[in-house]
Amino acid sequence: MSNTEIVVVGAGVAGLSAALAVAGTGHDVTLVTKAELVESNTYHAQGGIAAAIFSDDDPKLHAADTMAAGHGLCDPKAVDILTREGAERVREFAAAGVHFDRDAHGHMLRGLEAAHSRARVVHAGGDATGKVFELDVSAMVRKNPRIHIIENAFLKDLIVRGGHIAGVHLLIDGQDKDLAADR
């Protein structure tokens, strides 16, 4: 059985973000993905990302728009987290080098879409935001020496001990492999 400090399963935006966040705290992390690193649902996502990151906007306004568009079906706490932390993540990824669409002066472009009261939808590569995001963030992950990547590994099961996840049981090239994790 191999051992790692922390394991993250999945190489979409959530998994890549988690791996980078863990590595940023000084911990080693193993990122496990069922295909090539860039092959995820994020890669195929089209459209843009709504984020209240501009001076004429605020996450609370974004939350109000989301609640109104949801016609009472949205969880207010989840909407608050999404609009507040989502804006923070978009700023972080823009600063880290994700190639969001920009004008001739280098300002991030934004559009007014759907039920938004402010122009807050940003794109990368036009309508290929997911592809650009996945490629850019995957490159950041590959360059990070604290992140070990295991590609083409199918997650068969979680290893649970004492009610806590203690690792993952993987299928790699037809062979079973257990990867123990401290966290």
Spans of model-derived segments:
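Noncatalytic alpha-helical scaffold of FAD-dependent oxidoreductases
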Residues: 2, 25-26, 136-139
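Core beta-strand elements of the Rossmann-like FAD/NAD(P) dinucleotide-binding domain
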Residues: 2-4, 175-183
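N-terminal Rossmann-like FAD-binding beta1-loop-alpha1 element of flavoenzymes
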Residues: 5-31
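Structured core elements
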Residues: 7-8, 17, 99, 167-169, ...
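Structural detector for helix-capping/boundary residues
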Residues: 11, 153, 182-183
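A generic beta-sheet turn/junction motif
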Residues: 24, 172-174
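Conserved N-terminal/central alpha/beta ligand/cofactor-binding core
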Residues: 34-172
